[in-house]
């Protein structure tokens, strides 16, 4: 089980309570698909992903990015039991969607970059430690059901 300090809980909740999920979700997923183009293979049904401009303008990508950020709300509300909170989602991604679990880490890294860019100098070392710890636990939970 992960141990959270009061400071980490506060940092994480403060950050996510101020995020515009539509903006941050879209930017994070778009960044992942552009920087790591092999991740696009899971989004074939989302239409044209020909280049960065089409990815950034794709409403299905934007909507899925928002959905991902809202999915993190479950982890925020269950910080002491993230692994069990994401058990079904892990099964979906492993058994039905066959997503390479390393892609969760890539997306988490992109989300960290987008949050840091949004926060600017307020994204301190302590903030980064808390955000990366939180996202690492989420990534671990999503990869838990893989064989």
Swiss-Prot record:
GO terms for molecular function: haptoglobin binding; heme binding; metal ion binding; organic acid binding; oxygen binding; oxygen carrier activity; peroxidase activity. Belongs to the globin family. It comes from Gadus morhua. The keyword Metal-binding applies. Heme b binds at residues 64, 93. CDD domains: Hb-beta-like. Hb 2 is a heterotetramer of two alpha-2 and two beta-2 chains. Hb 3 is a heterotetramer of two alpha-1 and two beta-2 chains. GO terms for biological process: hydrogen peroxide catabolic process. This is Hemoglobin subunit beta-2. The gene is hbb2. One of its GO terms (cellular component) is hemoglobin complex. Involved in oxygen transport from gills to the various peripheral tissues. Red blood cells. Residues 3-147 form the Globin domain. PANTHER family: HEMOGLOBIN FAMILY MEMBER, HEMOGLOBIN SUBUNIT EPSILON. InterPro entries: Globin, Globin-like_sf, Globin/Proto, Hemoglobin_b, Hemoglobin_oxygen_transport. Hb 3 displays a Bohr effect, which is enhanced by organophosphates, and a Root effect, which is enhanced by ATP. Keywords: Heme, Iron, Metal-binding, Oxygen transport, Transport.
């Amino acid at each position: 089980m992960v141990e959270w300090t009061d400071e980490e809980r506060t940092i994480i909740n403060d950050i996510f309570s101020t995020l515009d999920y539509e903006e941050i979700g879209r930017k994070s997923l778009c960044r992942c698909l552009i920087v790591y183009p092999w991740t696009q293979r899971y989004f074939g049904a989302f239409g044209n992903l020909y280049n960065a401009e089409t990815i950034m303008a794709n409403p299905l990508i934007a909507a899925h990015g928002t959905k991902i950020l809202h999915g993190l709300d479950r982890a925020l509300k269950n910080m002491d039991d993230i692994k069990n909170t994401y058990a079904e989602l892990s099964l979906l991604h492993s058994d039905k969607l066959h997503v390479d679990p390393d892609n969760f880490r890539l997306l988490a890294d992109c989300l960290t970059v987008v949050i840091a860019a949004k926060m600017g100098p307020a994204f301190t070392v302590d903030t980064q430690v808390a955000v990366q710890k939180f996202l690492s636990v989420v990534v671990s939970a999503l990869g838990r059901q893989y064989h």
